[in-house]
Amino acid sequence: GFDVIDTIK
């Protein structure tokens, strides 16, 4: 998503 917030989830 934005940044690594939902990218790692």
Curated annotation (Swiss-Prot):
Q: Name one GO biological process term.
A: hydrogen peroxide catabolic process
Localization recorded for this chain is: Secreted
What GO molecular-function term can you cite, just one? Answer: metal ion binding
* GO CC annotations on file: extracellular region
Q: List the catalysed reactions.
A: 2 a phenolic donor + H2O2 = 2 a phenolic radical donor + 2 H2O
Identify the keywords attached in UniProt to this record, alphabetized: Calcium, Heme, Hydrogen peroxide, Iron, Metal-binding, Oxidoreductase, Peroxidase, Secreted
The reply to whether Iron figures as a keyword in the UniProt entry is yes
Cofactor list: Ca(2+); heme b
Q: How is the cofactor bound?
A: Binds 2 calcium ions per subunit. Binds 1 heme b (iron(II)-protoporphyrin IX) group per subunit.
Record EC number: 1.11.1.7
Q: Which family does it belong to?
A: Belongs to the peroxidase family. Classical plant (class III) peroxidase subfamily.
Biological function: Removal of H(2)O(2), oxidation of toxic reductants, biosynthesis and degradation of lignin, suberization, auxin catabolism, response to environmental stresses such as wounding, pathogen attack and oxidative stress. These functions might be dependent on each isozyme/isoform in each plant tissue.
Q: What protein name applies here?
A: Cationic peroxidase
Query: Organism, per UniProt?
Result: Betula pendula
Q: What is the organism lineage in this UniProt record?
A: Eukaryota, Viridiplantae, Streptophyta, Embryophyta, Tracheophyta
